[in-house]
Amino acid sequence: MRRIVLFAALFLILFQVKAELKLPKVFADHMVLQRGQEIPVWGEADPRQWVNVTFQGKKYRAKADKEGKWMLKMDAFPKGGPYILSINTKKESKVLENVMMGDV
C-alpha cells in the first residue's frame, strides 16, 4: 500500500513540472537589435506548443518541436525605438521593453 501511495505521489510531482517559456540571455530589456536585417528569435516552450511574437505591430508565429525548441525570423526594421517585444504561449508571456533598432 505504501508503494502505491509513494508511486502516486511521485507520478503527480513529475507531471506537475511546468515547462516554461525560456529565452536566451541575449533577449532582454534594453537590448539593441541590428537594423536592416532579418532578426532571428528563438527559445524553448512546451513541446509542440505555438509561440506568438509581436514587434512593432507585426505578428509572427512558430511551433515548438517535440523537444520544445522553436525559432522564427522577424522582418528587417529601420533604426528606431524604444519598442516592445512580446513573446507569448498559451500559458505564459514575456515582455521585453526598451528594445532599440540600430547598429550592433
Task: Label the model's feature ranges.
Residues 1-4:
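Positively charged n-region of N-terminal signal peptides that target proteins for export
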Residues 18-47, 99-104:
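Non-catalytic, glycine-rich low-complexity segments
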Residues 42-104:
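Extended acidic/polar, glycine-enriched regions
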Residues 9-18:
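Hydrophobic h-region of N-terminal signal peptides that target proteins for export
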